[in-house]
């Protein structure tokens, strides 16, 4: 959502075509208006007894959708674990007050200077230094009852352009990329409930050149297998130029092991929903993947409810 929900969007929520919402853009400058928007979508969802996931990019610094909430500091300026944890804990308190249950943070990418486009969004350029800071940020969020999301797996720190603008290939070797998985492993060990997949391609990890969020070797074999992540996997935005040439994106993402499909705009989201329904009707394998995803999402909802998150009152 880029602002208060439209009647058409609320109708889709009531029709159970939406599993969650993300607050995007700069339309959330009023805390009261943000809380009202969240209440309205939850009221629509609770007609069927199950609250929506409500997420926001609240990293700090330049990526801070809620200007009235912490963290004000960018990740690069959270130079100690105590500071990272305190900033995240303060953010969790503000998000909870607004009814927001998921922070799409921290960025676990290891910046590779001088050309990394991420700038101050990354905690730094040394995996051994970034890992404990990421873990501390995760602890700060989860201690406040907000689910943390490590992103953008398997790492965008060496990208020289944003995947929001065009397709990106990370041409680094396997040893280089593997060494920079330490912050993601730290996030998993610290209890991150979600991991967000990058839309870049990593030929050293998947020689087919398939974007990471569509890659079974990267999502299932590497993230779930090697790193042992059993939580919810969410895509980066699917309606970006980076994926414009990719066919059958929703079904391929689910087949790769993804649980949540994220879109920045309602039109592409509606189309993606229709495509996934079509694919599920045609494929028993997709239906099995969706059933496994539903179990992981149920576990996330249970974690949120146990930590004071949104519930639907009977």
What residues fall within each predicted segment?
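Second-shell residues forming the walls of enzyme active-site clefts
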Residues: 21, 29-42, 46, 128-285
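A charged helix-plus-loop insertion that forms the helical arch/lid used to bind
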Residues: 70-81, 124
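Active-site cleft segment of glycoside hydrolase catalytic domains centered on the general acid/base Glu
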Residues: 81-84, 114-134
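Divalent metal-dependent hydrolysis catalytic cores, especially in the metallo-beta-lactamase
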Residues: 18-24, 101-105, 257-261
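N-terminal hydrophobic targeting/anchoring segments and the immediately downstream early-domain regions
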Residues: 1-54, 60-65
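Glycine-rich, aromatic-flanked loop segments that form ligand/cofactor-binding clefts
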Residues: 42-70, 84-110, 130-154
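A non-catalytic, amphipathic alpha-helix used as a structural packing/dimerization or gating element
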Residues: 86, 90, 132, 136, ...
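Preference for extracellular/luminal or secreted protein segments
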Residues: 1-15, 64-65, 244-314
């Amino acid at each position: 959502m880029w602002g208060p929900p439209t009647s058409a969007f609320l109708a889709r929520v009531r029709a159970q075509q939406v599993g969650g919402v993300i607050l995007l853009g700069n339309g959330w400058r009023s805390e009261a208006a943000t809380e009202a928007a969240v209440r309205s979508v939850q009221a629509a969802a609770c007609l069927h007894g199950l609250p929506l996931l409500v997420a926001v990019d609240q990293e700090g610094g330049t990526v801070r959708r809620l200007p009235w909430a912490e963290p004000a500091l960018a990740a690069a300026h959270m130079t100690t674990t105590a500071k990272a944890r305190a900033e995240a804990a303060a953010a969790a308190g503000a998000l909870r007050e607004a009814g927001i249950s998921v922070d799409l943070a921290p960025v676990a990418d290891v910046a590779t200077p001088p050309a990394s486009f991420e700038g101050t969004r990354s905690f730094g350029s040394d995996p051994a230094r970034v890992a404990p800071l990421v873990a501390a940020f995760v602890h700060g969020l989860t201690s406040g009852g907000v689910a943390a999301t490590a992103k953008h797996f398997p790492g965008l720190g060496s990208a020289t352009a944003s995947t929001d603008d065009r397709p990106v290939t990370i041409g680094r070797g396997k040893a280089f990329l593997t060494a920079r998985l330490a912050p993601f492993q730290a996030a998993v060990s610290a209890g991150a409930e979600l991991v967000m997949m990058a839309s870049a391609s990593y030929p050293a990890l998947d020689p087919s050149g398939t974007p990471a969020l569509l890659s079974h070797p990267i999502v299932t074999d590497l993230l779930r297998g090697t790193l042992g992540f059993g939580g919810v996997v969410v895509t980066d935005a699917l309606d970006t130029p980076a994926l414009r040439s990719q066919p059958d994106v929703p079904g391929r993402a689910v087949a790769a092991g993804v649980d949540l499909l994220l879109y920045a705009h309602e039109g592409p989201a509606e189309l993606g929903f229709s495509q996934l329904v079509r694919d599920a009707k045609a494929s028993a394998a997709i239906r099995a993947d969706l059933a496994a995803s539903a179990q992981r999402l149920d576990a996330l909802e249970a974690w949120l409810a146990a930590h004071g998150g949104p519930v639907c009152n009977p």
